[in-house]
Curated annotation (Swiss-Prot):
Entries under HAMAP family matching the protein: Asp_tRNA_synth_type1
Gene Ontology molecular function: any one: aspartate-tRNA(Asn) ligase activity
CDD domains associated with the record: AspRS_core (cd00777), EcAspRS_like_N (cd04317)
Name of the protein this chain belongs to: Aspartate--tRNA(Asp/Asn) ligase
Lineage: Bacteria, Pseudomonadati, Pseudomonadota, Gammaproteobacteria, Alteromonadales
Positions contributing to ATP binding: R217, D218, E219, Q226, E481, G533, L534, D535, R536
Organism, scientific name: Psychromonas ingrahamii (strain DSM 17664 / CCUG 51855 / 37)
Catalytic reaction annotation: tRNA(Asx) + L-aspartate + ATP = L-aspartyl-tRNA(Asx) + AMP + diphosphate
Length: 592
């Protein structure tokens, strides 16, 4: 039906007769000469019909936007002065010889000026995907997947599929459950990741595994979260953490070079503790020049308990950021930032405008300046590198609250004031704690319970689990976690110890992980791996703000599909066959 794509018609085929198929992007009638902007997934080309083809021209007057058509025409150079440099096909046009309407279109339910809500776009996703920018994102994603496969194939990784119907295991989020018809009262779970199966593949001698795989998590959604998402999943045997990071970094560097012509350079490594101390986040955005500074030593003796209290508490922190040019912020702006930090548990926000550094205490403006002496202010200005016109923002509370609140404030203020540099800043974050405390006094793994500790015996780990550092690593780019992984536990006694630390009884461990504990008995090799979020990676590379823009048929923020009206109620007969009943008040049933 066609000899080439619309977006591929260039001066190279001048004078040739070609056939194209696609959709009408725009129709213009200029006094008997009909111009059609014809679109397919490759781009747009201009076709015109004139008096030399009266039948086709008459038909061209009847077409409207989104009619699906086929044309035969002659490729010509555009007249001088009519070249459109904004189009890849802007140097040519096609003299239409024949026109066939393959299918007509009713008026679109989407606004042609693209003033559509996300709900509308998802309801008519098949129309939304016709938009050139959406088509380009889908093509870009396909090329990223293709590159990843080629790279890993060349590195002798095996593409091995793992089960979708599997066993529910605790991995941090709720599982999507699938009732079994043949095993009454039992359920499969959709995998949150192929974690255990890829470890079993290493125990099977596969050596190097990868998979571009769907994963499922029943959790609250954000702009970068979906109930079903795609991972680039990797696992290796006989590689240490540095080797896994090296090969993963090489893949991402080459991907950015091929797809965006961007040189990412080498990735620096930063410990988890340093990232929290300097940036208040375990995924720091290095495009922002200013960072957090600890000033508790300056505030221990001030007569202002908001500062001196946390300054004298070993579990608390007093930290500041110095925002370049921030003195121009109004009191209203500052109050809004004060409300913002309360989201993260902070009680408020103290501030200090730097009018004239050379004057020390006299050169600053702040409600808390009266509690500070000349020596403290001078050291504060030196430590933060403050300049005239800056503003210093304070956080004083429990360490985790200050890090999270001031770290988030750093990002927000930088975005609001245009202080985020237009560049790519990658890094590795390493040396994460093995565990984090729960409110009930227990512990939970910071990553997952299959991550190995660094340099500890079983006895040493059980004696002080809170102090254990995991052999884990996250790749971060521009404040976004691209992927994460770890060296895995490959000895049964260490894995059993982790379960004990997590208060998982022997019976529960056998029920949920018996197959893993059994497999670890039979010469399991040292192994390590990681997984990248493909959706998030493509989102970053295409410069959009939501992974819904790079997924063909995504869910809404409420985990629903407006296009198909999923989820939907099931037929009672089907539920009966599955031995499943729907209850009006599940909380009441659970309590009973």
């Amino acid at each position: 039906m066609r000899t080439m794509y619309c977006g591929e018609v260039t001066e190279a085929v001048l004078g040739q007769e070609i056939q194209l198929v696609g959709w009408i992007n725009k129709q213009r009638d200029l006094g008997g000469v009909i111009f059609l902007d014809m679109r397919d997934r490759a781009g747009i080309v201009q076709v015109f019909f004139d008096a030399d083809t009266p039948i086709a021209t008459a038909l061209a007057t009847t077409v409207r936007n989104e009619f699906c058509i086929q044309i035969k025409g002659l490729v010509r150079a555009r007249p001088e002065g009519q070249v459109n440099k904004d189009m890849t096909t802007g140097g040519i046009e096609i003299l239409g010889l024949e026109l066939e309407i393959l299918n007509r279109s009713e008026p679109l339910p989407l606004d042609s000026n693209q003033q559509n809500s996300e709900e509308q776009r998802l309801r008519y996703r098949y129309l939304d995907l016709r938009r050139p920018e959406m088509a380009k994102r889908m093509q870009f994603r396909a090329k990223v997947s293709s590159f990843v496969r080629r790279f890993l194939d060349d590195q002798d990784f095996l593409d091995v599929e793992t089960p979708i119907l599997t066993k529910a295991t605790p991995e941090g989020a709720r599982d999507y459950l699938v009732p079994s018809r043949t095993h009454k009262g039992k359920f499969f779970a959709l995998p949150q990741s192929p974690q255990l199966f890829k470890q079993l593949l290493m125990m099977s001698g596969m050596d190097r595994y990868y998979q571009i795989v769907k994963c499922f998590r029943d959790e609250d959604l954000r702009a970068d979260r979906q109930p079903e998402f795609t991972q680039i999943d990797i696992e290796t045997s006989f590689m240490n953490a540095d080797q896994v990071m090296e090969i993963s970094e090489e893949m991402i560097v080459k991907l950015f070079k091929e797809m965006l012509n961007v040189d990412l350079g080498n990735f620096p490594k930063m410990t988890y503790a340093e990232a929290l101390r300097r940036f208040g986040s375990d995924k720091p955005d290095l495009r922002i020049d200013f960072e957090l500074y600890d000033v508790a030593d300056l505030m221990k003796d001030v007569e202002f308990n908001v500062f001196s209290g946390p300054a004298n508490d070993p579990d608390s922190r007093v930290a500041v950021i110095c925002v370049p040019g921030g003195a121009k912020l109004s009191r209203k702006n500052i109050d809004e930032y004060g409300k913002f930090v309360t989201i993260y548990g902070a009680k408020g926000l103290a501030w200090m405008k730097v009018n004239e550094v050379a004057k020390g205490l006299e050169g600053v403006q702040s409600p808390v300046a009266k509690f500070l002496n000349e020596e403290i202010v001078t050291e504060l200005l030196i430590r933060t590198g403050a300049k005239d016109g800056d503003i210093i923002l304070f956080g004083a509370d429990k360490s985790n609250i200050v890090s999270e609140a001031i770290g988030a404030l750093r990002l927000k203020v930088a975005q609001d004031l245009g202080l985020v540099k237009d560049q790519w800043k990658p890094l590795w974050v390493i040396d994460f704690p093995m565990f984090e405390p729960l409110d009930d006094g227990g512990l939970t793994p910071l990553h997952h319970p299959f991550t190995a500790p660094i340099g500890l015996t079983v006895e040493e780990l059980e004696a002080n689990p809170v102090g254990a550092i995991s052999n884990a690593y996250d790749m971060v780019l521009n404040g976004c976690e691209l992927g994460g992984g770890s060296v895995r536990i490959h000895k049964q006694d260490m894995q059993a110890a982790i379960f004990r630390i997590l208060k998982i009884s022997d019976e529960e461990a056998e029920d949920k992980f018996g197959f893993l504990l059994e497999a670890l008995k039979y010469g399991a090799p040292p192994h390590a791996g990681l997984a990248f979020g493909l959706d998030r990676l493509v989102m970053l590379m295409t410069g959009t703000s939501s992974i819904r823009d790079v997924i063909a048929f995504p869910k809404t923020a409420s985990a629903a599909c407006p296009l198909t009206n999923a989820p939907s109620f099931a037929n009672p007969a089907v539920l009966a066959e599955l031995n499943v009943a729907v209850v009006a008040d599940p909380k009441k049933v659970i309590s009973e």
